């Protein structure tokens, strides 16, 4: 059994060993898996960022960021403008015509984050989103992403097996 509440704008980590159900919990929260009992209350649109960046190698940074909007059929001029603003605001605009294989691991994760933010989620689920990065890059990227989420006013729930990573960013851990 698990019970917790996350207030708007908070960054919360669920920390535990591999196989304990952290990713399953995120899948239940996202509505991708059914729960066996209990209740889940979500107030807002959810974005989901996985361990692997899942950037499409044949698409430019800009076209990768537009992907979620295309899938949701919301690739409007207003949303395209918002994406361009995000890319500029977070230092990725100059790389908009590059392909994923031309980016560092940290930059790829930032592109994946901007792609997730493009759909304007109120809640972001991070499933071991930085574990594929080396320690130094992970520290830098998690700090960058934490600042971006705070700046955008997004509530985040991160799962990790790394205690130091979870405690570094979060005010609350489960």
Would you name each region that the model predicts?
Residues 153-159:
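Conserved H-loop
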Residues 30:
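Helix-to-loop junction immediately C-terminal to a conserved catalytic motif
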Residues 113:
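Hydrophobic anchor residue at the start of the ABC signature
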Residues 15-17:
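The feature captures the beta-strand-to-loop junction immediately N-terminal to the Walker
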Residues 62-70, 80:
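Short helical segment in ABC ATPase nucleotide-binding domains corresponding to the A-loop/adjacent helical element
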Residues 98-101, 119:
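Conserved signature/switch motifs of ABC ATPase nucleotide-binding domains
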Residues 138-152:
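Helical segment within the ABC ATPase nucleotide-binding domain
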